[in-house]
Amino acid sequence: MDALFHLRDMIASLDVPLTDDLCARARLPRNDDLYALNGAAAPAPEELAGAYAGSTTLAGRVLLLRPFYVRAVLPALCAPGGGAAERNACIAADTACLNSLARRLALSIHVATRKREALPDALQTALGTGDPARVENAITNLSVEAGVLARVEARARKNGADADTVRRLAVLYADVLIPLSRKIQVHGLLAEA
C-alpha cells in the first residue's frame, strides 16, 4: 500500500492549486452568459467517469469536464451575476479551475490501479459481483475523505476565503468532487476486472 499512500500525497499536492483556483473563482460571479452549452445537460457522474477514464489527454479531459463544471461546480461555488467587466477574469479563472480539476481527477485512475494491485478482500469480493455500488463502497475510506476536506478547508482559509466560501468548497468536495473521483476509480477497477 506504500504506492497508494504516495498517490494520496500526490493528490494532496494537487488539491493545493485546485483549492487556490476554486477560491479565486469563488470571488467572481458565475456570469452565465459566458457558457454556451447549446442546451447540453451535464453528464451523469457514471457517464462522465467512464468517458474521463477513457480519455488520455489533458485537453480531452478538460473538454469532457466543461459541461459538468458549468452545470455542477460553478453553481455550487459562485453567486449568479456578472457582466462584461468580469468576462476576462471569469474565463481565466475557469480555465485554471478546469486544468487543476483535470489534473487532480487524473490521479483517480492511478489510485484505482494501486487499489487493484493491493486487492484487499472486501474489494476482491465487490469486484466479483460486478456491482458498481459495492465496488464504490469497498474503496471508500471515510477517514481519508475527512482528511481531504480538512485540508481543503484549511487551504481555503489560508487563501483568505470567508466562512461561506470555505463551507461551499467543503460541500463541493464532499458532494461532487470526491464522489466523482470515486466513480472514476470504480470505472477503472471494473474495466480491468
Where are these regions (language model features)?
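Extended amphipathic alpha-helical regions
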Residues: 1-193
